[in-house]
């Protein structure tokens, strides 16, 4: 665990012990959104060592957005996971045996080919233990786009011009919102073509939804509305691609991004 992850983890533990202690009601969130996270690859002998991190991600999401239908996709049920779902009836555990610990391709394959079957609402908000909302404002990002996530298009004139011309707004999927119709179409292409692909960039979950399908399939490119960079930066930031972030976005992805916000005083730690 690096220093950035340690800082985020300490903050998550502190919040669970204070803000979220004994709390079971976060109010009602939008009925049009399902929240989903993966919980897999944990240590076989101590599977719940880091469960507090995914619990924190869900609780922070509910705190800022209200309680919504919530799905946890896992390779196996664990004691803490089952206890969490029992405490919060809005949480559904979905067992996926194809998830292999340490193999990111198996998660990407599930995102690419099975997302559409994992929810029935208009939108899916994907969160991770290092990617979730930090403030209220979810409604601003619903009903306008089929995908919004931390932008990976660089803050330069020509990259953004090309993105605007061809609707190629490459983005991170670890913390994102995507529409049901996008997931339906992505699943269709997966079953027809991409299920046969080996582990490669084209089928990595981020690239598949925001790059591969946009470049290779006219129907997808013409149908799907991707959030532009300016809107995406208000939604979330991932510091792997530098962007002109001037205030706290709705959420974040990556522990290093969390530290970036903390160093600017946007998060109290």
Placement of each model-derived feature along the sequence:
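N-proximal low-complexity "stem/linker" segments adjacent to membrane-targeting elements
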Residues: 1-56
